[in-house]
A protein has these predicted regions:
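Aromatic-lined carbohydrate-binding surfaces of glycoside hydrolases
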Residues: 63-65
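Active-site acidic/histidine proton-transfer and metal-coordination neighborhood
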Residues: 73-184
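Short, contiguous strand/loop micro-motifs
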Residues: 7-8, 31-33, 76-78, 122-126, ...
Length: 266
């Protein structure tokens, strides 16, 4: 059975962030992930992990100015300096937290966004070339500590309008373009269901290129069992395929976090 990590940006939101580590451990989780750690010193987070015997499974590189609507920097030609700084920042946290995976957000396509005016005339080819170069830089930096960089297709229809990497097939093609052994696809089953479906065949054909999995049901992005996705079947499939990585529980509990955990395999 796969290993499940609590996403502390979504789960145990009933309490302040530092207390969520204790709640996750008490609920039986042995690993945690979250969006961003940068509001807290890495040494403090490391102590919360140690105190609760938890593994830091994954976190994101900085997305830029999240409050202003930015959702990553990797595809934006005018932000390459900021991207490089975000890599160094995340590298420092990953070393202190002993974290072997980081997710690199692609960013929003300039078309129709506040940055569009500054990028008028920038082609899709230029965006992709910037993204590939940035991912290669990040991969080479994280290789120095034995860590893997994740790229995640995120649906632009419901959750993140304008997101540049919004197609699963595009994600696999970009892996080939980046051509680094420590860059893998982060396969979020919720997003993948909205983008294209065909979950089982995608997993079967590409499990060797998938380095992390996240889950939520659809519609609603709530816990497994509240929507249309057959998670017991998919968990069995992952076992048959030999997937030994983590599965991040990145869902919004329908009621409380504790009440949402009944789906967890015993």
């Amino acid at each position: 059975m796969p290993k499940f990590a609590a996403n502390l940006s979504f789960l145990f939101a009933e309490v302040p962030f530092p207390e969520r580590f204790n709640r996750a451990a008490a609920a039986g989780f042995t690993g945690v992930e979250y969006l961003f750690p940068y509001e807290y010193p890495a040494s403090e987070i490391a102590e919360w992990l140690r105190a609760n015997d938890l593994e830091q499974v994954l976190f994101n590189l900085s997305a830029g100015d999240w409050a202003a609507g930015e959702r990553g920097l990797a595809c934006l030609p005018h932000r390459q300096g900021d991207f490089a700084e975000s890599v160094e920042q995340a590298l420092g946290y990953a070393m202190v937290l002993d974290c072997g995976r980081v997710h690199c957000l692609a960013g929003l396509s300039p078309k129709g966004t506040s940055s569009g005016a500054r990028l008028a005339g920038v082609s899709e080819a230029e965006l992709e070339a910037t993204y590939v170069a940035n991912l290669q830089f990040a991969a080479d930096r994280f290789a120095t500590i034995g860590a893997t960089v994740m790229i995640e297709p995120i649906n632009s229809r419901i959750d993140m309008p304008g997101y540049w990497l919004d197609d699963v097939g595009k994600g696999f093609r970009l892996l080939e373009a980046v051509d680094r052994s420590n860059v893998k696809l982060q396969y979020d089953i919720y997003h993948a269901q909205i983008i294209a479906g065909d979950l089982a065949r995608t997993l079967e054909a590409n499990i060797h290129r998938i380095g992390h999995i996240q889950i939520a049901d659809n519609p609603g992005r709530h816990e497994p069992g509240t929507g249309e996705i057959n998670y017991p079947f998919l968990f069995d499939l992952l076992d048959r395929l030999g997937y030994d990585g983590w599965i991040g529980c990145e869902y919004r509990p329908l009621t409380t976090t504790e009440a949402s955990l009944g789906w967890l395999p015993k």
